[in-house]
């Protein structure tokens, strides 16, 4: 598995398996199969409500000798409602995952909300049916909590998720331990070149969630526009004898982002790893750069009642 060295000094595999919205009854089998075919990076979150199930799969993998803990890279994320309780939330995730440390801990959204209980990950709405944001906690305070998880030995690397450029800049300014990773939506239809280049310039690894666009997974949630249907990408895929999804992932890796695709199907899991076995030409990379639509598919405003990217 190809890796990249983070600013923290640790190695992170450039392809991870995203575990969002995987069904609980299939999660264990998916993780074990993924490990068997070569996956070493798993992307979790408290909000996915599956950390305990992931923990059971990891425990079995370790017990049976399928893989050693030090061979895996485990990421999880703190939810909005726990910004004021970072260390406690981290320990809660570790307990569920049945591991002693996290390889990477991310702030899921730059948006503290009303706390209810550690690890419960509620998104409480106010009387106006709008997400109840906690204005008493600053993102700097949240980051200080993240830094404490490192000093306590709970976490090796810390980072951001769904942060825009200027919030990333602010974190770089006030942090004592710099964010090693910034995970955000990016794919051929939403390339975010300025954010990608800014992160790379300042030693933050850009990591693509939703690297295929979201329509293939859930059209009701993400809309029907998908780069997988794009004629340019389909032509490139035919040229290389690959799937459009493989072209999207390979493009992401060649622009020096890590990618976190999601799948539960063993054949697609294998195909996703195969993107490490070929390269796109410079001409085809530029061709894909030309199809950017600035089309964001991940829109929490649909359930939270406000545009969190405003």
Swiss-Prot record:
Residues under site feature: Lowers pKa of active site Tyr: 77
Gene3D superfamilies: NADP-dependent oxidoreductase domain
Keyword Endoplasmic reticulum carried by entry: no
Binding site for substrate: 108
This enzyme's EC code(s): 1.1.1.200
A molecular function GO annotation: aldose-6-phosphate reductase (NADPH) activity
Keyword set, alphabetical order: NADP, Oxidoreductase
Keyword Oxidoreductase: yes
Pfam families for this protein: Aldo_ket_red (PF00248)
Binding site for NADP(+): 210-272
Origin superkingdom: Eukaryota
Family: Belongs to the aldo/keto reductase family.
Name assigned to this protein: NADP-dependent D-sorbitol-6-phosphate dehydrogenase
Organism: Malus domestica
């Amino acid at each position: 598995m190809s890796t990249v060295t983070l600013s923290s000094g640790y190695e992170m595999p450039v392809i991870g398996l995203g575990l969002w919205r995987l069904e609980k009854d299939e999660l264990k089998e998916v993780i074990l199969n993924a490990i068997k075919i070569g996956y070493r990076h798993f992307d979790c979150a408290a909000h996915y409500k599956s950390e305990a199930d992931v923990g059971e799969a990891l425990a079995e993998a370790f017990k049976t000798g399928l893989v050693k803990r030090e061979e895996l890279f485990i990421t999880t994320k703190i939810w909005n409602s726990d910004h004021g309780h970072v260390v406690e939330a981290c320990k809660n995730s570790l307990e569920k995952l049945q591991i002693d440390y996290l390889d990477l801990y991310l702030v899921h959204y730059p948006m503290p909300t009303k706390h209810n209980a550690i690890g419960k990950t509620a998104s409480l709405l106010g009387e106006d049916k709008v997400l109840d944001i906690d204005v008493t906690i600053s993102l700097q305070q949240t980051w200080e909590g993240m830094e404490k998880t490192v000093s306590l030995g709970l976490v090796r690397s810390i980072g951001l998720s769904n942060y825009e450029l200027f919030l990333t800049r602010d974190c770089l300014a006030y942090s004592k331990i710099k964010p090693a990773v910034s995970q955000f939506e990016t794919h051929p239809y939403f390339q975010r070149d300025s954010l990608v280049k800014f992160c790379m310039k300042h030693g933050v690894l850009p990591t693509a969630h939703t690297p295929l666009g979201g329509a293939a997974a859930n059209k009701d949630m993400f809309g029907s526009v998908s780069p997988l249907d794009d004629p340019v990408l389909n032509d490139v895929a035919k040229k290389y004898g690959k799937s459009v999804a493989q072209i999207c992932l390979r493009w992401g890796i060649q622009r020096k982002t890590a990618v976190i695709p999601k799948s539960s199907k063993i054949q697609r899991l294998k195909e996703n790893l195969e993107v490490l076995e070929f390269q796109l030409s410079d001409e085809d990379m530029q061709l894909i750069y030309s199809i950017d639509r600035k089309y964001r598919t991940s829109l929490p405003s649909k359930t939270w009642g406000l545009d969190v990217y405003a």
